[in-house]
Amino acid sequence: MPRIATIGFFDGVHRGHRFLFAQLHEHAKHHQLTPTIYTFDRHPKELLTGQAPAMLTTHDERKALLQNYGEVIFLDFAAVQQLTAEQFMCYLKEQEGVETLLMGYDHHFGSDRLKGFHEYEKIARKIGMHIE
């Protein structure tokens, strides 16, 4: 089944995360998509700066928490950190079956660190993906 997905490290599940996951479930149910949470095996800051931030949860605790909200897929950040936003979105669409990407209001991804939501929307239109 095609996916609706969100991406983030999600160390601990706070109110903002729960709101995002509720939207993920509503949209998945309405459009018959698999709710999917993409997260990373290690915190991106650890690989980018060499310093791991203090964690609220262990890997296993985080997995257990996130599984309450959808299928959880751990990505190797080192393997995807050089991808631009467009390359990463193409990977999600073509290799993972992601039809819709749900983003938080201040979320950024890709080695090019696009500045705003409208830039991700432009890429989504180009590759035939929905973004919200």
Task: Kindly label every feature range from the protein language model.
Residues M1-E132:
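Nucleotidyltransferase catalytic core that binds NTPs
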